[in-house]
Amino acid sequence: MLVVELIIVLLAIFLGARLGGIGIGFAGGLGVLVLAAIGVKPGNIPFDVISIIMAVIAAISAMQVAGGLDYLVHQTEKLLRRNPKYITILAPIVTYFLTIFAGTGNISLATLPVIAEVAKEQGVKPCRPLSTAVVSAQIAITASPISAAVVYMSSVMEGHGISYLHLLSVVIPSTLLAVLVMSFLVTMLFNSKLSDDPIYRKRLEEGLVELRGEKQIEIKSGAKTSVWLFLLGVVGVVIYAIINSPSMGLVEKPLMNTTNAILIIMLSVATLTTVICKVDTDNILNSSTFKAGMSACICILGVAWLGDTFVSNNIDWIKDTAGEVIQGHPWLLAVIFFFASALLYSQAATAKALMPMALALNVSPLTAVASFAAVSGLFILPTYPTLVAAVQMDDTGTTRIGKFVFNHPFFIPGTLGVALAVCFGFVLGSFML
């Protein structure tokens, strides 16, 4: 039966990959329907994860319409054009900190055209900085103070003596170090010379490659204000999470959990941005960030539900099979997280589906925290929105998906980044936890 269920899950994901975009969420729902038809009980839908993403996307979309995203992209472009030789290193650093700031990797979508353009002008294969930038944004989700994944992980680890601040003190430096080392390795080990790529040369001869140059962006009057309002919201979430933390003991009985606090604060930020920056709410619905974010929510709804259905109905088999192995080789937990995240399509959904199982197997808090970064394997299957966008934005043809699905330019940098983040997590965690 397990084999049949796995085949259904893989076929649903394959269909979703063929449909593309929001279609993977649709196919996930179809997969759950087929599993239910053969007697498998549907799993849990990660509504708390989806609600956090929706609230954060609403605030970011309001900021985008107010001009805040253009302002951030403009600052990014200035940084990259001042240091074009280091594009493969700087691009992932930029997307890392933007994701830390926003709590969602969708914010990096706005920077991808700039990264691709600067790379072309410098004669660097766009696939190098684009791949490291996309992967960096995915890894940064496991370090953002307001991401659904970190908020959930914090709530789980509180009962094991790991506070919100302790968690951040490990995941932020370990993931940042991993991104830096991964970027250096990609720069040194792979040929980045654009003129050496035969597909690029062919497309150039056919006139399919265009150099657009630096775009002049008109920054709206409320742009900086919208960025500061969003930053204020992020700080508010962090402060509340610290105050709310049982290990801090500042509040005996908190009024609400951190998830609800994020929803309230982010919706309030969206309201203040709309009022103070005079934003037309109709334009928010039509913004690229809102569309991408809501599409991601549907994808997570379908795929995470499909993945949780499979995992929850086979949890005993997973425990029996993996229990002794993980206790003897704790690092294998990271491997399980890594491949499961490709099926569950969300860092938070993966943590929510598998972290309780890991802790039930008496995995140490250090192993759980260090392995947390491994839930960032969303790049394994080339279907995630930021990954697909990077492929579409590169008109040189260097960022392409191979015939065998897994042979794409994101796989090696991503695997390197995740492996390094886990290793650094074990090292730093042994000192800090």
Curated annotation (Swiss-Prot):
Disruption phenotype: The growth the dcuA-dcuB double mutant is severely impaired during anaerobic growth with glycerol plus either fumarate, malate or aspartate, whereas single mutants are either unaffected or less affected, depending on the C4-dicarboxylate. The triple mutant dcuA-dcuB-dcuC is completely devoid of C4-dicarboxylate transport (exchange and uptake) during anaerobic growth, and the bacteria are no longer capable of growth by fumarate respiration. Mutant cannot grow with L-aspartate as the nitrogen source.
Side of membrane Cytoplasmic, spans: 19, 72-85, 148-228, 283-292, 351-355
Signal peptide: none
Stored InterPro entries: Anaer_Dcu_memb_transpt
Topological type in the membrane: Multi-pass membrane protein
Subcellular location: Cell inner membrane
Transmembrane regions: 1-18, 20-37, 54-71, 86-103, 133-147, 229-246, 265-282, 293-310, 333-350, 356-373
MF-aspect GO terms: C4-dicarboxylate transmembrane transporter activity; succinate:fumarate antiporter activity; symporter activity
Any one of the GO BP annotations: C4-dicarboxylate transport
UniProt keywords, alphabetically: Antiport, Cell inner membrane, Cell membrane, Membrane, Symport, Transmembrane, Transmembrane helix, Transport
Catalytic activity: fumarate(in) + L-aspartate(out) = fumarate(out) + L-aspartate(in); fumarate(in) + succinate(out) = fumarate(out) + succinate(in); (S)-malate(in) + succinate(out) = (S)-malate(out) + succinate(in); L-aspartate(in) + succinate(out) = L-aspartate(out) + succinate(in)
Ranges per topology, Periplasmic: 38-53, 104-132, 247-264, 311-332, 374-433
Function comment: Responsible for the transport of C4-dicarboxylates during aerobic and anaerobic growth. Required for the uptake of L-aspartate as a nitrogen source during aerobic growth. The uptake of L-aspartate in aerobic conditions is coupled to the excretion of fumarate, resulting in the net uptake of nitrogen without carbon uptake. In addition, during anaerobic growth, catalyzes the uptake of fumarate, malate or aspartate coupled to the export of succinate. Can also catalyze the uptake (without exchange) of fumarate. May play a a general role in anaerobic C4-dicarboxylate transport.
Family membership noted in the UniProt record: Belongs to the DcuA/DcuB transporter (TC 2.A.13.1) family.
Protein's UniProt name: C4-dicarboxylate transporter DcuA
Organism in which the protein naturally occurs: Escherichia coli (strain K12)
Taxon lineage: Bacteria, Pseudomonadati, Pseudomonadota, Gammaproteobacteria, Enterobacterales
